[in-house]
Amino acid sequence: MQVASAETYPPLPAGPFAVGCSSVEQDFARMQPGESPQLYWEGIPADDGRPRYITDLLTNPATPVVTFNVPDDGELYGKLAGKPFNVALIVCYPAAVDAGRRPYNLPNGVAVPRMQLGDQPPAFADDTRRWPLLEFAHGLAGSPLDPDYMFAMQVLASNGYIVFAPFHADARVTDVKLEDLQDVIHAVSNFGDYTAMQAVRTLALKNALDYMLASSVWNGHIDANRVAGFGASLGGESLFLQAGAKLTDSVGLSSKQVLVDNRLKSIATYVPYLGQTFFPALGRDQSGIDFMNPIPVLAIAGTADTTAPLAATQQAMERLNGTNILVSLQGVTHGFDFASADDIFTWTVVFLNATTTRDPVSLARLQRMTNVAGGGDDRVVLADVLPYPPAGDEENVVEFFNESLGHYFMTANANEIAILDAGVAIQGWTRTGEVFKAWPIGSAHGQQVCRYFGTPGVGPNTHFYSVDPNECAILSHDPQWTFEGYVLQADRAIGGTCAAGEMIIVRLYNNGIGGVANHRYTNSPTIINQMVSEGWVVEGPVFCTPP
């Protein structure tokens, strides 16, 4: 990454909270000889066709089990259409240390921490606080009680999130494996069941969220305006679908929307399965993602992952609008890479804190972070971090582009924005979609930013902005430049950086490409790298703006 302010951050310390979880008490004596509990947790039928699910082993009526009706849509749900379906849940949360709860040890070596027994209520670290809620969607052929998933849930809960995870038990619908879908013949012959399994996963997440927000046990502790998702492998795709992306529903790559859940505010994913480049999961060329709500998305992908290849993930991420970050882990294959745990959870927690709890320091860190120290080799592939909506006396600075001139222009002036949007009096300018925030002239925040335009017939046909009084003074004595006024306020970048809670705006120069000078101002590392590849020069951080 070319931005001078890019930073390597240390791994986040352990979360500040102890963790407790809801009951998953089970009677393993109910299993047949030779069976393992994983067969029930994953919903794998017996050889004679007898269904198996975790509900067959559960002994505590207080364990959440959500039952819902599948829509009567055979195209999406196949044999499940119009029938009832159920999912059990486990919920982990920030817990009181001295609640007297003990771990519940499972046969696979996992200990469920401070588990509720009988009708015990959850024992929160702060019973008066409302916590952000995090959906946790595990991958295919797994369960929340797998060691890596339980570890991940505890990390996230220890950082102040109520985390709930459905037991998807995908084998109840199909025995197709992700690896099988790399075989086109196998994909075609099993595609109907596979589509149904993907679609019902999304329904399960939506209905589980309904339950959490309505349950008298949990709803009084949840901030319903701060709901996010974490998905691993196929769980990542499930969250994309919940946010409105269309699912590939035929071998011809047609796609169909499962649902749109507007409650989901951001999505973090690890090795998200989004199909193969030749068989994308979200429609042709991943175009189904165009129908997804424009919420922030983080994707962490392995460069050696052939099951969920980085190329397919990048193809989808490049279609997103809004805050989106793609991080690659060098040499990592599919599955949880414990050597990269610090990288995975530092990126994830910083992202969730920035986009869900709206912590300005986390948002500024997210913009600057290029990798996490130690651990695996993590690298940013794509990064666009948008500011929060304006608050108080903040205002948006909107960027425009004129294709015939090859020039960029930015303004916070409402009249200028309206004129350029109308395209009548001044033609040829369109919004790029890029914005950053500033303060208006006269604000108690920031310093005045001067704007100059090249003097007609003498100077360049472009605008120049500076918060540096020395630069403004130099231009005022240069006949090539005409002063247009002070147009916004921002803090000045000192030593190439900004305060912890501010966004960094970098100035780029086109190096005279096309014969006429032009500058561009951006907080996007992706744009910076793109412009550098086109011959632009990074002049460095110039403004510090509100997050």
Language-model region placement:
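Alpha/beta-hydrolase-fold serine-hydrolase catalytic core, especially in secreted/extracellular enzymes
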Residues: 8, 331, 338-391
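Alpha/beta-hydrolase active-site loop
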Residues: 184-219, 224
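Primarily recognizes the serine-hydrolase "nucleophile elbow" in alpha/beta-hydrolase
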Residues: 208-282
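Short conserved active-site loop signatures built around small residues
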Residues: 5-129, 162
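The feature captures the conserved acid-bearing segment of alpha/beta-hydrolase catalytic domains
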Residues: 125, 253-328
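Acidic beta-to-alpha connecting loop that harbors the catalytic carboxylate
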Residues: 140, 234, 303-306, 331-333
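Extracellular glycan-binding segments that recognize GlcNAc-based cell-wall polysaccharides
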Residues: 392-547
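Short substrate-entry loop that stabilizes the transition state in hydrolases
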Residues: 99-101, 123-176, 306-307
